[in-house]
C-alpha cells in the first residue's frame, strides 16, 4: 500500500501516545542534502523573489513528502535578523555589553525586521503544503541562544556577575521580543502549523553551558511565557535542546513541553532518555549523527531498524530521526539508509499485523 502522509501521526507523538505507525522527524535538513535526493537545484532560491520562493518551497515540501514525513519542519530564526548579530558563532562580542547598549538597541524595530523576511517565506510554505501534511516549527531560536547572539557567551558570564539586574532586564526584553513575534505568528499561521517548537541549546557533552541555577533564574521564566502562549492557542510544544541537560529537564517538563528532541550517544544512550522521561513526554530522534557519518551505508539501515524497533517498543510517543539534524556534511547515502531503516520497521509491523 502506498505511503500516506498524515500529520495526525505526529500529533499522537506530541500527546505521548503510540502512533499507529512509526513517524520520522528532523529538526533541520540542509537544502543541499535535499537537492541531492531530489536531483534538483533550488537551495539558493529561498532568498529570491516570490517566484523563486514558491519554487523553493515546492521542492522543499516535496522532499518531506517523498521522504515519508508527516509534517514539514520549518522555522525562520530570530538571530539572523538581529542588528549586529553573530556573537553566537564566536570570535566577536555582541552589540549589547552594558546598560547603555541595552537601552539604545532598536528593540522596537525587531519584530518588524523579522516579519519583513519571515512573512513571505511562511506564505510560500503554506501555499505549497502537500495534502495530508501540516507544518511543524515556527519562530526559530530560544531565549539562551538569543542572549548569546546579543552579548556573547563569555560576556554573558561577566554581565551576570557584574550587573545581575542588567542580566535580568536583558532576558526580560528577549522574552518580550519572543512573545511579540510568536503572538503574530499564531494569529497568522496557527492553521498551517500543527506543532510549534523552538530550539535552544543549553548544554554540551558534560554539563549545561551555564549553571542550572542561572537557567532557572533567567531563561526558564521566559520559556514559560512562550510555551503558555503556544499552549493557549491549542498547539503542542516541542523543545529542541542539545547537550547534557538532565539537571534542568524536570524544570522544563514542568513548564508544559509536550516532547523533546536531540540526543547524542556520547552523552547518554537514547534508551536512558526514554527510561527517565518517556512516561511524561514524547521523545524524538535516537539515531546519532555520527552513525550516519561514520558507518557504511549497508550497516546503517540494519542498525536503525534494530534501534528504532527498540525505541518504539519502549517509548509511548516516539518519532525516529537523527539525534540532532542533517547538515550538509552528512553523506546523503547515510541519510537515505536511515529512512530505509524506518521504512523497514513500518513494513515489519504491517507483516506482523497480517500474521496476527
Where in the sequence are the language-model features?
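Active-site loop segments of alpha/beta catalytic cores
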Residues: 1-53, 59, 70-74, 93-94, ...
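Detector for C-terminal structural segments
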Residues: 32, 80-86, 330
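Glycine-rich, N-terminal phosphate-binding loop and its surrounding beta-alpha-beta segment
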Residues: 56-84
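N-terminal hydrophobic/helix-forming segments and targeting peptides
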Residues: 87-88, 92
Amino acid at each position: 500500500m502506498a505511503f500516506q502522509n498524515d500529520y495526525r501521526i505526529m500529533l499522537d507523538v506530541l500527546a505521548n501516545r503510540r502512533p499507529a505507525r512509526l513517524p520520522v522527524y528532523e529538526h533541520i535538513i540542509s537544502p543541499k542534502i535535499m537537492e541531492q535526493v531530489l536531483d534538483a537545484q533550488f537551495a539558493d532560491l529561498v532568498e529570491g523573489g516570490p517566484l523563486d520562493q514558491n519554487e523553493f518551497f515546492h521542492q522543499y515540501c516535496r522532499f518531506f513528502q517523498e521522504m515519508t514525513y508527516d509534517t514539514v519542519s520549518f522555522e525562520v530564526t530570530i538571530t539572523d535578523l538581529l542588528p549586529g548579530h553573530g556573537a553566537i558563532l564566536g570570535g566577536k562580542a555582541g552589540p549589547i555589553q552594558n546598560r547603555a547598549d541595552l537601552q539604545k538597541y532598536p528593540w522596537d524595530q525587531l519584530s518588524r525586521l523579522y516579519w519583513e523576511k519571515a512573512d513571505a517565506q511562511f506564505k510560500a510554505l503554506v501555499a505549497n503544503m502537500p495534502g495530508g501534511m501540516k507544518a511543524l516549527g515556527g519562530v526559530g531560536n530560544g531565549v539562551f541562544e538569543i542572549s548569546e547572539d546579543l552579548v556573547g557567551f563569555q560576556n554573558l558570564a561577566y554581565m551576570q556577575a557584574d550587573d545581575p539586574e542588567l542580566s535580568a532586564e536583558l532576558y526580560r526584553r528577549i522574552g518580550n521580543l519572543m512573545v511579540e513575534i510568536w503572538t503574530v505568528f499564531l494569529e497568522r499561521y496557527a492553521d498551517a502549523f500543527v506543532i510549534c517548537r523552538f530550539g535552544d541549546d543549553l548544554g554540551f557533552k558534560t554539563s549545561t553551558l551555564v549553571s542550572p541555577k542561572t537557567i532557572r533564574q533567567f531563561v526558564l521564566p521566559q520559556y514559560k511565557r512562550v510555551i503558555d502562549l503556544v499552549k493557549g492557542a491549542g498547539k503542542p510544544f516541542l523543545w529542541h535542546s542539545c547537550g547534557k541537560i538532565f539537571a534542568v529537564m524536570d524544570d522544563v517538563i514542568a513548564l508544559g513541553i509536550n516532547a523533546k528532541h536531540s540526543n547524542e550517544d556520547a552523552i547518554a544512550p537514547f534508551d536512558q532518555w526514554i527510561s527517565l522521561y518517556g512516561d511524561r513526554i514524547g521523545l524524538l530522534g535516537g539515531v546519532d549523527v555520527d552513525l550516519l557519518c561514520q558507518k557504511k551505508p549497508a550497516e546503517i539501515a540494519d542498525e536503525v531498524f534494530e534501534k528504532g524497533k527498540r525505541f518504539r517498543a519502549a517509548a509511548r510517543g516516539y518519532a525516529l530521526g537523527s539525534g540532532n539534524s542533517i547538515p550538509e556534511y552528512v553523506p546523503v547515502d547515510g541519510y537515505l539508509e536511515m529512512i530505509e531503516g524506518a521504512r523497514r520497521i513500518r513494513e515489519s509491523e504491517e507483516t506482523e499485523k497480517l500474521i496476527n
